Amino acid sequence: MEAFSYVLILTLALVTLFFAVAFRDPPKYDK
């Protein structure tokens, strides 16, 4: 189960970084 824990932690870290960048810098692209 260690692999699952590592994947979960890495996913949470990536999501946190993504939201930090998204909220710090408004997206420049339009849908």
UniProtKB/Swiss-Prot annotation:
Protein name per the record: Photosystem II reaction center protein T
Localization: Cellular thylakoid membrane
Record-annotated membrane-spanning stretches: 3-23
NCBIfam families: PRK11875.1
Family: Belongs to the PsbT family.
Biological process per Gene Ontology, one example term: photosynthesis
The keyword Thylakoid is assigned to this record: yes
UniProt keyword terms in alphabetical order: Membrane, Photosynthesis, Photosystem II, Thylakoid, Transmembrane, Transmembrane helix
Gene this chain is encoded by: psbT
SUPFAM superfamilies, per database record: Photosystem II reaction center protein T, PsbT
InterPro entries xref list: PSII_PsbT, PSII_PsbT_sf
Main localization (coarse): membrane
HAMAP family xrefs: PSII_PsbT
Native source species: Prochlorococcus marinus (strain NATL2A)
Pfam family, one: PsbT
